[in-house]
């Protein structure tokens, strides 16, 4: 009986380890070719809006908000290694920061405590009404970085265009990103 339990536990553990071999986005492993991965995103309701040499853009809803997804892949093998969620722009710093804090809380529950850098530098300070100018000029950083054994997740605020900022979440699969870098190095 003990042997059966040990064997079953070993099999279960190997399934769990296999299932967690790649970082996921919306429960879709960040793995496979662009066509395979994009087909899964289309099935989840996203629409392709652009195809470029190293990324494919899709539009849809994530966490109840309109966004653009940027699916990054290896130029050599077309293997997907990262997904960027770029939320639609916002003008209101308070709303943007609130969204950032809510998403950071959820990511912290899922991935653990992040490395955080949230600051305005002189001559700017939070609440002075110049948040966009501070971000545009490099006087502000708002980023939470989560590191796991299988990948990296970053949540950050960036300026988008005149007087607008946006919230971005990046999901990078460690294994496929390293594979992509090696493929590029092999080309040199």
Feature locations, PLM:
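Periplasmic/extracytosolic POTRA-like scaffold domains at the N-termini of outer-membrane
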Residues: 25-32
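A cross-family detector of function-defining hotspots
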Residues: 33-79, 84-188
